[in-house]
Regions:
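Peripheral, non-transmembrane regulatory/ligand-interaction domains of membrane transport proteins
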Residues: 1-147
Length: 147
């Protein structure tokens, strides 16, 4: 499933994605092969970036492409009753887009409906990338407290 967000007047808003839009965050949760192929073609991202992104056994790393960067991290996932595991979260940065890819909905990524206290600006992709990493770290530290 592909969901697009864009910062409009300092608010993170859900928008319908158009390849001509710049400064958009595309949130992919359990993407289908068709969605991956469509996005790889329209956003001009190497298809192998998406294969690495959805490989659950892949290790965290950063891959540099010609016009994009892929960062793969592991984030904590709650399985209830104080049981935690990790799940890969892949972040692709292009000049116009920030794309996050995960197998399941991850709380590390702020949802526009949650009224996040942090001001998220999707047009500032480097800052947005570091905010995603910060959220992952915060959730990880909260998870450790319950172990």
């Amino acid at each position: 499933m592909i969901t697009a967000y864009k910062t409009i007047q300092n608010q993170l808003e859900k928008v319908s994605w158009d390849p001509s839009l710049k400064g958009v965050w595309l949130k992919l949760v359990n993407p289908t092969p068709e969605e991956i192929l469509q996005l790889a073609t329209t956003a001009q991202i190497p298809e192998y970036f998406f294969r690495f992104a959805v490989d659950e056994d892949d290790c965290p790393r950063i891959i540099l492409g010609k016009k994009c960067i892929l960062a793969i991290i592991h984030v904590p996932i709650s399985h209830g009753d104080y049981r935690y595991g990790t799940s890969p979260l892949s972040i692709i940065l292009t000049p116009d887009l920030t794309i996050t890819i995960s197998d399941e909905s991850i709380q590390v990524i702020p949802d526009s409906t949650e009224g996040s206290r942090v001001s998220l600006d999707t047009t500032k992709r480097t800052q947005f990338f570091f905010q995603i990493l910060y959220h992952a770290d915060t959730v990880f530290l909260q998870s450790i407290r319950y172990m």
